[in-house]
Swiss-Prot record:
Highest taxon of the lineage: Bacteria
InterPro entries: Ribosomal_uL18_bac-type, Ribosomal_uL18_bac/euk
Organism of origin: Rippkaea orientalis (strain PCC 8801 / RF-1)
Listed name of the protein: Large ribosomal subunit protein uL18
GO cellular component: cytosolic large ribosomal subunit
Quaternary structure and interacting proteins, as annotated: Part of the 50S ribosomal subunit; part of the 5S rRNA/L5/L18/L25 subcomplex. Contacts the 5S and 23S rRNAs.
Gene name per UniProt: rplR
Described function: This is one of the proteins that bind and probably mediate the attachment of the 5S RNA into the large ribosomal subunit, where it forms part of the central protuberance.
One GO term of the biological process aspect: translation
């Protein structure tokens, strides 16, 4: 039986999470992509807490965007999460694409975070 797209993403995400782990020195930049929005969190897996987060559902970001499901919106989230991480003193992260392919909105978020100063 063929897997649905959602099942494929979940299976890929479980496989990736076995290898990708965030530490206090090098936390994990986790990306979740839904049909309408995109979310990014910088997570310390050892301490089990979120250091910084950004998404297209935030009111100030939502007002400036025409849609939360575009590459432009993803780039804005990437830039915002990078700025918040740098304010917390985080420069080096591990990228967790959340089982999604590194293409389109996920790639736009990663590129914007790199341009804003995060290293991964």
């Amino acid at each position: 039986m063929k897997l649905s797209r959602k099942e494929s993403v979940q299976r890929r995400h479980r496989r990736i999470r076995k290898k990708v782990n965030g530490t206090p020195n090098c936390p994990r930049l986790a990306v979740f992509r839904s049909n309408l929005h995109i979310y990014a969190q910088i997570i310390d897996d050892v301490g089990q807490h979120t250091i910084a987060a950004a998404s297209t559902v935030e009111p100030d970001l939502k007002k400036s965007l025409s849609s939360g499901s575009t590459c432009e919106a993803s780039a804005a989230v990437g830039k915002l999460v990078a700025e918040r991480a740098l304010a917390q003193g985080i420069e080096q992260v591990v990228f967790d694409r959340g089982g999604n392919l590194y293409h389109g909105r996920v790639k736009a978020l990663a590129d914007a975070a790199r341009e804003a100063g995060l290293q991964f």
